Every structure is written in structure tokens, then in C-alpha cells.
Amino acid sequence: MFARSAATILAFVLVTLTAATPAYYAPGTKTTSVDKAVPAGQCNVGNQQCCNTVQEASSNPVAGLLGLLGVNVQDVTGLVGLTCNPITGIGGLNSNCDASPVCCENNSFGSLISIGCIPISL
């Protein structure tokens, strides 16, 4: 009799704790899927960037950076690249990018952030 009561109480406690525990989402782990990459030849050479991170403008770290720069998140189209470097080479050919090669519209924030990016294939 006691074993049955203890098992019932234990099951109730476990269910209660599981239901009351908030879900954990690790910051910065949001991934973005892209259906089709633009060929590098269709992007202006000066706009080709190799970014360490590419995320949606609404993601937590990117939205915070955009806010500090005075950029409205709702006005951003495309992805946002962080810590980007220009891809050198004629038309992006024979260039090497081990991170995320993207074509960005607005690179006016130096190498910290590039706005309006779309993935490209080199």
C-alpha cells in the first residue's frame, strides 16, 4: 500500500515539475534556411562579403546592435551579416570564404555589420 502511494506521489511531483519548468532556448542558436543562393556573378564585387555570422534582423543579438546604430529593425530586408570582410578577387572568383559568403546592400558600418544580405555561391 505504501509503495503504491509513494509511486503515485513521485509521479505527480515529476509531472508538476516538468510542466512548471520553462523551456530553455540557447541565445544565438537561431538558424536560417535559404532556398536558393545567388551566383556570385550576379552581385556587385564591392557588395560581396564573407561574414562569420548571418542572422535575421529580428534575432536578439542583431536587433540589439541595430538599435545601437539607430537602425529600425522593421526597415531591414534580407539577412544581417556580423563581422564581415570583403571578398577579394575578380568577380569573387578564386576567392576563399570559410564562413558565410553573402551579397549585402549596405556595408556602411565597417566590418562589424552588413545589412540586407543574401547568401551567394562562390
From Swiss-Prot:
Disulphides: 43-103, 50-97, 51-84, 104-117
GO MF entry, a single one: structural constituent of cell wall
Induction / repression: A CT-rich motif, which is often found immediately upstream of the transcription start point of highly expressed filamentous fungal genes, is present at the expected position. One additional CT-rich region is also found upstream of the TATA box in the promoter region.
Glycosylation sites: 106
Record keyword Transit peptide present: no
InterPro entries on file: Hydrophobin
Residues making up the signal peptide according to the UniProt record: 1-20
Location in the cell: Secreted; Secreted, Cell wall
SMART domains named in the record: HYDRO
GO CC annotations on file: extracellular region; fungal-type cell wall
Keywords, ordered alphabetically: Cell wall, Disulfide bond, Glycoprotein, Secreted, Signal
Signal keyword on record: yes
Main location: secreted
Family of this protein: Belongs to the fungal hydrophobin family.
Subunit details: Self-assembles to form functional amyloid fibrils called rodlets. Self-assembly into fibrillar rodlets occurs spontaneously at hydrophobic:hydrophilic interfaces and the rodlets further associate laterally to form amphipathic monolayers.
Function summary: Aerial growth, conidiation, and dispersal of filamentous fungi in the environment rely upon a capability of their secreting small amphipathic proteins called hydrophobins (HPBs) with low sequence identity. Class I can self-assemble into an outermost layer of rodlet bundles on aerial cell surfaces, conferring cellular hydrophobicity that supports fungal growth, development and dispersal; whereas Class II form highly ordered films at water-air interfaces through intermolecular interactions but contribute nothing to the rodlet structure.
Protein name: Class I hydrophobin 4
Species of provenance: Flammulina velutipes
